[in-house]
Amino acid sequence: MSLLPRATPAAMGVSSRAIDALLDRLEENIEPHSVMIVRHGHVIAEGWWAPYTADRPHLLYSLTKSFTSVAVGLAIADGLLRLDDRIVDVLPGRVPPDVSAQGHRLTVHHLLSMTAGHPQDSLTEAWELEPDDLVKGFLRVPFTTPEGTRHTYDNATTYVLARMVEKVTGRDLPGLLDERLFAPMGIGHAEWDRVASGAAFGFHGLHLTTEAVAAFGELLLRDGVRQGRQLIPADWIELATRRHADTRHGDDWANNPDSLCGYGYQFWMSRHGYRGNGAFGQQCVVAPSQDLVVAVTAAATVEDSMPGALWDCLLPGIGRPDPAGDDQRLADRLKRLSLPPVTGDAGPGRSATAKIDASQDAALPEGTVITVDPMPGGGWRLRLGESVTVEAGHGGWRESAPLGRPVVTTAAWRGDLFVADLYVITTPHRVRLTVDAGTGRASAVWSTVPLTGPILERHLRAPLMTRPDVA
């Protein structure tokens, strides 16, 4: 069942040629996986680059933070949490004995706005200090600026928020959002990556379909009301999507003018509205002045490619609809979107064996034995060590789920080289596997290295679970 109604671009006053230009820009600058454009509450353009599909949830990375913000807003609306509540009061059992005076003062507001006072993202150091409890680790990392004075993008702040919400509501974060947000929206497929205790990261790890992301943006645009029901408090949306911190000092964002517009409560401000933003190009962009929502999933290595492409390509087409023939040409293009399968030959029809010569951030450990066997009727069976076996198609893709999560693979021979692309299809990431039948050497290299580590086997398990931690 669709979450949003459909219409043509012209019917909603948008140029299909402008959307066409946006598709061109995305394909030139990033590896796009999906796009959905919503105007006046109607989907006017939607497409998935094969092998990605409409029904497949996609890892959102830090776009997850915007959903955690909603959970905080629900807890506040229920009277269970306040913006000035302190970490030490809500989670007293997770406060280290040597917590600093500044750590004592940190509140929900400081966490939401990422103005706790750490000089940089504290996540890695916090986990090194307290491998079993990130909350304690976060409070032990030294603060270098007074709270509330400087924004530093800090993943651990959102983790602490998630634990605070769980403490005051008595619900785990996924369960709370399933009941209060996703189920009323008609979303039943949300999946969360977790730490080893089973707790959701909160700052990343949510998987949703592109339409679910777009429907979330549309819900924000409608002040939290869906089908006459108030799912998110309107005053929370207004507060969360307002600037609370200046980001103009952030050198990391210097190439992206939208990232200099400020930070709200787990939302980025933008030149024409606001957005939820995730690594490698996961985007939910809301432009209230244009009654517009755009959802994108991708494997982007150029982080400044979005949302600038929307403003450059799409905004000039607002209020300038094109003839019906142009709408149809766009619809035809959207149906044919595809990433390129591996090119090369279907033969020779022989097996090959090689061992991984691992580089830094390789997807498979050094010495992993790779076996390539032709299959009756075409394609290949690939054995990657002892625990992972997948099938690969020629000129297309074949799907396998060796450890729970699907991987979709395309391959071909290029002389003595066997080349395969393994798409971890619920994420932005793929692995380029190369087997040299002549030398017996192989490599497995990520197109973009997952932020949760390079080992492929980990990303094929559902749910992905990393890091020790207490519940």
Segment roles from a protein language model:
Residues 157-164, 204-225, 282-299:
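Active-site-proximal alpha-helical segments within enzyme catalytic domains
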Residues 324-471:
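Peripheral terminal and inter-domain segments
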Residues 117, 121-152, 158-194:
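A small/polar active-site loop signature that marks catalytic segments
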Residues 18-53, 291-295:
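A short, well-structured edge-of-sheet supersecondary motif
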Residues 59, 78-116, 140, 168-204, ...:
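Active-site helix/loop module of the DD-peptidase/beta-lactamase fold
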Residues 41, 58-84, 111, 161-165, ...:
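Active-site SXXK
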Residues 238-294:
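Active-site Gly/Thr loop motif
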Residues 278-338:
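Structured C-terminal helix/loop/strand segments within mature extracytoplasmic catalytic/sensor domains
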